[in-house]
C-alpha cells in the first residue's frame, strides 16, 4: 500500500458500550473496503478483530486491535476497542493516540453506562466523533429516544444526517439528508450493492424538515450559509459538509448516521462520513511534550521530515518478547534504527516494523508521522513511554491509568508452575498498566489486582493457556484505600552505621486530610528553599510516594491526604540520600498511624435492566446490599434501575440477578468513588470505628 498524503489519512477508533455492535461494525468495514473476503461474525467466534480465544468464547472484545484499510483513496487506521468496563485501559490508550472516533449506540438500549464512560474519555482527549445508531432493525428501536439521551446524558449536540426508511424489522434503508436521496442496500450480495434514488413522496416533508435542521447546525460554523438560509437560498451538500466538518473538528457537533451492521445496512455511508468529517493528522493540534528535566513545552507538527517522536501506547507479549504499538507523531524511522526512550533514559532499537492487521503482521521498512505501527526489538519500553530522536529529546504526556479495585490471591499448582508463575505475570504486566502484582508480606501469597472479576478471570485463563502455568485462586477481594482523619506533625530521625560510618537523615513532616477523591498531594519545597541539594530533595519526594503506596496499617495504599515536608535538616558528614529516604518513609508511616487512620471502600455505579415484573424483588436486593437508588426509568415492559453500591456487595451478582429474573436481567457497573468502609470492615483490620 503506497503511502497516501497526510490529508488522506484517518486514524480512528470504534468505541461504545459492550454489545452495541462495535466489532460487527469493524468486521463490515473490513469486508466492504476489501480487506477481508468473508464477513467475520462475533456470534460465530470468527470475527477477525476478536482473535484471542477468550474473546471468541465470550463474544466480547477484550483487547484493542489495530488494522488498516482503504476507502475512497483514504487510508483508515482502524482500532476496535472493548466495551466492558474491566478493560477500560484499552479504550484509554486507544483514545490517547486516535485523531477521531466512531461512537456506536444501540437503537434499542440507547445511551448505556459504558457509552457515557467512553464518551467522557473521548472528551478528555478532545477526540472528534461521529455517531452510528446501530440495530435500527430490532424490535424496540427508538431513534428519537436515543438522540434525546445523547443530549441529556452526554450533553452532546447530535446532528441527524439520515432518516430511517421502515421501522424495526421493516428497516430497509435511509434518507441521506445532505444529498436528498434514498439509500438502500441489496440483501442478495451481503449489502455490497448500494442503490441511490429519489426520496419517496411520503417522506419528502420529513426529509425537507430534516435537511433544514442540518443546515441550521452548519450555519453555526459558516456565516455565508447563515446568510443564504435567511434569504431562502438552496445550499449544496458540499457546502454543508464543509461547515459541518468544522463543527466536528471543534467537538461541538456530532453527526449521526443510522443502520444495522448485522443486516449489512448503513456501513458504506458511515465510511463516507469518516472520510468527510473526521480529522486527518494535519487537522489535529500538534503533539506537545516537555524536554527532559525541564518545564519547557515543545510542539511537534505532524511532519514526516521533522525529528522522530512516537508514543508507545500498547505493549504486547508475544513468545516472551515485546511487541510495541506506536503512534508516530513526527519524523520518519527505518527498521533497525536506534531511538531514545525519554521515559526510561536509554537507547532502544527498532529491530523490525510491522503494519498490524488484528494479530497478523505485515513487515514494513519504515514508519512516518501519522502512522500506527508495531515494533519488535524494544526491550525496556512500557506503555506510555516516549521514543524520540536522540538529538531532539522530548517526553510526551502519558496515559491516565485508573487504579485497580479487585484483588485475587493465586498460588502455583506444582513445582514446575511455581518457576514459571512470576515470569508469566511480569509479561502480562507489560501489556496492562491496570494489572498489578505484589506479594502479601504476612502470608507470602501472590496477589493480583485488577479492574474487576472478569479482568482477573481472563488473566488466570491466559496464565494457563498461553504460559502453561497452573494456578489455584482464592476468592476475589476488594482493594480498599487507607486515609487519615486528623492532621499531625512528626519529626523522624534515622541513624545507622555502615562499614564503620554513621549515615542518617532527618525530616519534619506535616500530614493533613483532604476531601474524598483528592488523592495524594506531596508538597516538597524547592531544594533552594530547604537549603539542601536537589538529590536529597528528590530522594525525600520519592520515598514519601513509595510509602503512601505501601500504606500505614493495612498495606492498602494511602489516599486523600496532603504530605508537606516542612524541613530536611542536614548534618554534614552524616546526612545521605539513603538516610533521608529511610527517615521520610518511616516518618510517613508512623505519622499516618497517629492521624486516625481509617479505610475507604470502592463504590460502584450500577445499572440494572430487568422486566418490570421483577422490579420490586431486585430493588429490595439492591437495598440489602447497602445500595442507594439513584433513579428508576421505564421503557415499554423494561425497567432500568440506577444505583450506587459498594463493590464488596457485588461479587457473584450476575448469578444472583439471573436467578431472581429467570435469566432475563442484565447489569453493568463502573467505579464511582471511595467512601468510608463499614464498621465491621474497620474492626477486621483493627481500626477504630
Curated annotation (Swiss-Prot):
What Pfam families does the annotation carry?
EFG_C, EFG_III, EFG_IV, GTP_EFTU, GTP_EFTU_D2
Tell me the PROSITE patterns matching this sequence. Answer: G_TR_1, G_TR_2
Which controlled-vocabulary keywords does the entry list? Cytoplasm, Elongation factor, GTP-binding, Nucleotide-binding, Protein biosynthesis
Query: Molecular function terms in GO for this entry?
Result: GTP binding; GTPase activity; translation elongation factor activity
The record's InterPro entries line, in alphabetical order, gives: EFG_II, EFG_III, EFG_III/V, EFG_V, EFG_V-like, EFTu-like_2, G_TR_CS, P-loop_NTPase
**Top-rank taxon, per record:** Bacteria
Q: Cite the binding residues for GTP.
A: 16-23, 80-84, 134-137
Q: Which GO terms describe its cellular component?
A: cytoplasm
tr-type G domain mapped to chain residues: 7-282
* CDD domains in alphabetical order: EF-G (cd01886), EFG_III (cd16262), EFG_like_IV (cd01680), EFG_mtEFG_C (cd03713), EFG_mtEFG_II (cd04088)
Instruction: Keyword check for Iron, yes or no.
Output: no
User: For this chain's UniProt record, which GO biological process terms are given?
Assistant: ribosome disassembly
Q: Where does it reside?
A: Cytoplasm
Described purpose of this protein according to its UniProt entry: Catalyzes the GTP-dependent ribosomal translocation step during translation elongation. During this step, the ribosome changes from the pre-translocational (PRE) to the post-translocational (POST) state as the newly formed A-site-bound peptidyl-tRNA and P-site-bound deacylated tRNA move to the P and E sites, respectively. Catalyzes the coordinated movement of the two tRNA molecules, the mRNA and conformational changes in the ribosome.
NCBIfam families membership? EF-G, PRK12740.1-5, small_GTP
Q: Which family does it belong to?
A: Belongs to the TRAFAC class translation factor GTPase superfamily. Classic translation factor GTPase family. EF-G/EF-2 subfamily.
The protein's name is: Elongation factor G 1
Q: Which organism is it from?
A: Geobacter sulfurreducens (strain ATCC 51573 / DSM 12127 / PCA)
Amino acid at each position: 500500500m503506497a503511502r497516501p498524503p497526510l490529508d488522506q489519512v484517518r486514524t480512528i477508533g470504534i468505541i461504545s458500550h459492550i454489545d452495541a455492535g462495535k466489532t460487527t461494525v469493524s468486521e463490515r468495514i473490513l469486508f466492504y473496503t476489501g480487506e477481508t473476503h468473508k464477513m467475520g461474525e462475533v456470534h460465530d467466534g470468527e470475527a477477525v478483530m476478536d482473535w484471542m480465544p477468550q474473546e471468541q468464547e465470550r463474544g466480547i472484545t477484550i483487547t484493542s486491535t489495530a488494522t488498516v484499510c482503504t476507502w475512497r483513496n483514504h487510508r483508515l487506521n482502524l482500532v476496535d476497542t472493548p466495551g466492558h468496563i474491566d478493560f477500560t485501559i484499552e479504550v484509554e490508550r486507544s483514545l490517547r493516540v486516535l485523531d477521531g472516533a466512531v461512537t456506536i449506540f444501540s437503537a434499542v438500549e440507547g445511551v448505556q453506562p459504558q457509552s457515557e464512560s467512553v464518551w467522557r474519555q473521548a472528551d478528555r482527549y478532545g477526540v472528534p466523533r461521529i455517531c452510528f445508531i446501530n440495530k435500527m432493525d430490532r424490535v424496540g428501536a427508538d431513534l428519537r429516544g436515543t438522540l434525546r439521551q445523547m443530549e441529556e446524558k452526554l450533553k452532546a449536540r447530535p446532528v441527524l444526517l439520515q432518516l430511517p426508511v421502515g421501522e424495526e424489522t421493516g428497516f430497509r434503508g435511509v434518507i441521506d439528508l445532505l444529498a436528498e436521496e434514498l439509500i438502500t442496500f441489496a440483501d442478495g450480495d451481503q449489502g455490497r450493492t448500494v442503490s441511490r434514488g429519489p426520496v419517496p413522496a411520503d417522506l419528502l416533508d420529513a426529509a425537507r424538515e430534516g435537511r433544514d435542521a442540518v443546515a441550521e447546525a452548519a450555519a453555526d460554523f459558516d456565516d455565508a450559509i447563515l446568510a443564504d438560509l435567511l434569504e431562502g437560498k438552496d445550499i449544496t451538500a458540499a457546502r454543508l459538509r464543509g461547515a459541518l466538518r468544522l463543527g466536528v473538528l471543534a467537538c461541538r457537533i456530532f453527526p449521526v448516521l443510522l443502520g444495522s451492521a448485522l443486516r449489512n445496512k448503513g456501513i458504506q455511508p458511515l465510511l463516507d462520513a469518516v472520510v468527510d468529517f473526521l480529522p486527518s493528522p494535519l487537522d489535529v493540534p500538534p503533539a506537545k511534550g516537555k524536554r527532559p528535566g525541564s518545564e519547557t513545552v515543545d510542539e511537534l507538527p505532524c511532519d514526516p521530515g521533522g525529528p522522530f517522536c512516537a508514543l508507545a501506547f500498547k505493549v504486547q507479549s508475544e513468545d516472551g518478547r515485546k511487541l510495541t504499538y506506536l503512534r508516530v507523531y513526527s519524523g520518519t524511522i527505518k527498521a533497525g534504527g536506534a531511538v531514545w526512550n525519554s521515559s526510561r533514559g536509554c537507547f532502544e532499537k527498532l529491530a523490525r516494523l510491522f503494519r498490524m492487521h488484528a494479530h497478523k503482521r505485515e513487515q514494513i521498512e519504515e514508519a512516518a508521522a501519522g502512522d500506527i505501527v508495531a515494533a519488535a526489538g524494544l526491550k525496556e519500553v512500557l506503555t506510555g513511554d516516549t521514543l524520540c530522536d536522540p538529538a531532539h529529546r522530548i517526553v510526551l504526556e502519558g496515559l491516565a491509568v485508573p487504579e485497580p479495585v479487585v484483588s485475587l490471591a493465586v498460588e502455583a499448582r506444582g513445582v514446575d508452575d511455581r518457576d514459571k508463575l512470576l515470569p508469566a505475570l511480569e509479561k502480562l504486566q507489560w501489556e496492562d498498566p491496570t494489572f498489578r502484582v505484589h506479594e502479601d508480606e504476612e502470608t507470602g501469597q501472590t496477589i493480583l489486582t485488577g479492574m474487576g472479576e472478569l479482568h482477573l478471570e481472563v488473566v488466570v485463563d491466559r496464565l494457563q493457556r498461553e504460559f502453561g502455568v497452573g494456578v489455584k485462586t482464592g476468592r476475589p477481594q476488594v482493594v480498599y484505600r487507607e486515609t487519615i482523619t486528623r492532621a499531625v506533625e512528626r519529626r523522624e530521625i534515622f541513624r545507622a552505621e555502615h562499614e564503620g560510618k554513621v549515615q542518617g537523615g532527618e525530616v519534619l513532616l506535616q500530614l493533613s486530610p483532604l476531601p474524598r477523591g483528592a488523592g495524594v498531594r506531596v508538597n516538597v519545597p524547592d531544594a533552594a528553599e530547604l537549603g539542601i541539594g536537589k538529590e536529597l530533595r528528590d530522594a525525600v519526594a520519592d520515598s514519601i510516594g513509595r510509602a503512601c503506596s505501601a500504606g500505614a496499617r493495612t498495606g492498602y495504599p494511602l489516599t486523600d491526604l496532603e504530605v508537606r515536608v516542612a524541613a530536611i535538616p542536614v548534618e554534614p558528614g552524616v546526612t545521605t540520600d539513603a538516610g533521608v529516604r529511610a527517615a521520610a518513609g518511616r516518618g510517613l508511616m508512623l505519622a499516618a498511624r497517629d492521624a486516625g487512620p481509617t479505610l475507604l471502600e470502592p463504590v460502584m455505579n450500577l445499572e440494572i435492566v430487568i422486566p418490570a415484573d421483577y422490579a420490586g424483588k431486585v430493588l429490595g436486593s439492591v437495598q440489602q446490599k447497602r445500595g442507594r437508588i439513584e433513579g428508576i426509568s421505564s421503557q415499554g415492559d423494561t425497567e432500568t434501575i440506577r444505583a450506587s453500591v459498594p463493590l464488596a456487595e457485588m461479587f457473584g451478582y450476575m448469578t444472583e440477578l439471573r436467578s431472581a429474573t429467570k435469566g432475563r436481567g442484565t447489569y453493568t457497573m463502573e467505579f464511582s468513588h471511595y467512601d468510608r468502609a463499614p464498621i465491621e470492615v474497620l474492626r477486621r483490620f483493627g481500626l477504630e470505628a
